[in-house]
């Protein structure tokens, strides 16, 4: 994926860059795999904001992605097109199965139009094929990994993400996550061979606030510039430091929020690199 940098003709263009979309082979999505996608503005059914910084954005339609592929074991599929998906950072691939059905999957790096892919325990170890972890050789790079057998892919689905299969111990596979965390996953879970494509997406510079608004992202305002009614750091005469340790708008201490006694902790072999905020 190449990135086009603009000449500084305006302040917004000065810092902007966009994808060349060279991998994309079709601009019109498959109509039968589209669903309406309504906007919430970050509100729940009571109309209260439950997620901040969400609102507006370009109208989208959701593309149905097959994250399981279990019911297509042994049925070969041809990659008809590589398409853009506005709902995720990765591109998607449209598969035409031999039985006539069409489905979308996450497009891995190197998957080309016309390639034949397959799912199932007996599938070859090649990019785009989906197999149980017990059938994948140690050291293989994989993506779209399940956390529970049959639940659908949950791990490594965004652009450029990949997981390495380090080994197998009894009924568990040992995986190195994109965060460098090493964890166990049930060996019956399925994964797709290869890494997710469109890795250069992380290098795109949005350049101006308006492009983020097109994506449905609203501004993030610092608490120290708010009024006392809006944030614990708000108020004061002139510019202040907030006057207390950093907290959320609801007064909770800033830092990690993961439950230290989470039920899945026993599946983590080694934590990710400890350079995060505590």
Swiss-Prot record:
Composition skew (Polar residues), residue ranges: 258-267
Composition bias type Basic and acidic residues, residue spans: 23-33
One GO cellular component, as annotated: large ribosomal subunit
The keyword RNA-binding belongs to this UniProt entry's keyword annotation: yes
Region Disordered, annotated ranges: 1-53, 224-278
Swiss-Prot/TrEMBL keywords: Ribonucleoprotein, Ribosomal protein, RNA-binding, rRNA-binding
BP terms from Gene Ontology: cytoplasmic translation
GO MF terms held by the record: rRNA binding; structural constituent of ribosome; transferase activity
SMART domains in the record: Ribosomal_L2, Ribosomal_L2_C
InterPro entries, per the entry: NA-bd_OB-fold, Rib_uL2_dom2, Ribosomal_uL2, Ribosomal_uL2_bac/org-type, Ribosomal_uL2_C, Ribosomal_uL2_CS, Ribosomal_uL2_dom3, Ribosomal_uL2_RNA-bd_dom
Ranges of compositional bias, category Basic residues: 269-278
Pfam family, one: Ribosomal_L2
Keyword Nucleus: no
Subunit relationships: Part of the 50S ribosomal subunit. Forms a bridge to the 30S subunit in the 70S ribosome.
Family: Belongs to the universal ribosomal protein uL2 family.
Described function: One of the primary rRNA binding proteins. Required for association of the 30S and 50S subunits to form the 70S ribosome, for tRNA binding and peptide bond formation. It has been suggested to have peptidyltransferase activity; this is somewhat controversial. Makes several contacts with the 16S rRNA in the 70S ribosome.
Name the record gives this protein: Large ribosomal subunit protein uL2
Organism ancestry: Bacteria, Bacillati, Actinomycetota, Actinomycetes, Mycobacteriales
Gene: rplB
